[in-house]
Amino acid sequence: SRGLGDVYKRQICTRFPGKREKLMNKQNSTVMKLAETALLAALCYVSFTFLQIKIPVPGGDATSLHIGNTFCVLGALLLGGWYGGLAGSIGMTIADLMDPVYITGAPKTFVLKLCIGLITGLVAHKIAKINETNDKKYVFKWSLIASIAGLAFNVIADPIVGYFYKQYILGQPQEVASILAKLSAGATFVNAIVSTILVVIIYNAVRPALIKANLIRVYVTAANAK
């Protein structure tokens, strides 16, 4: 139960002062990441809702040019895949739910944006380990690669998933679903290029300041020290 958990934590803190500090740091870090995730989710919502160029398509549907994915990928680079993915999922799903044109696509949006964040985070933090080096060229290269990986997934997955989603879940005719998928592919490709450029510029610009402010912790290993 929660009460027993709190008692256990207090016992650990009393008997092991060092663990108390680590426990508090971990809790503070989690709270900070959740707050930053909420901020990025808000940016996803605002950028998609108010900065998009909506393109009407047959059947009363629409696709759009937007930079909402920028903050999903940025979150994955700054906070990790799960946090970035959740920021994109929450922010852009709410945006879909608030728009009558996109409301039926909200479940698809939630899943795809979460996957964008997870893929970006996997490449950036599990493969490249960008938080274990201060090498600016290395970080720039892998932030670019990670952004491309996450957004390239979306370029491929969005029209394919959208095609089957609209045809089999929403019951749209195959011809209409096919046209929508082709239009979506073109718009998603343009969005991916713009978002990649923005993410790499923003991330590499703010990273040094965030490190100094202890909002990003870099654990430089001997192998990665420069």
Q: Language-model features: where?
A:
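Loop-helix junctions at membrane interfaces
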Residues: C13-K226
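Short, small-residue-biased leader/transition segments that mark boundaries at the very start
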Residues: S1-Y8
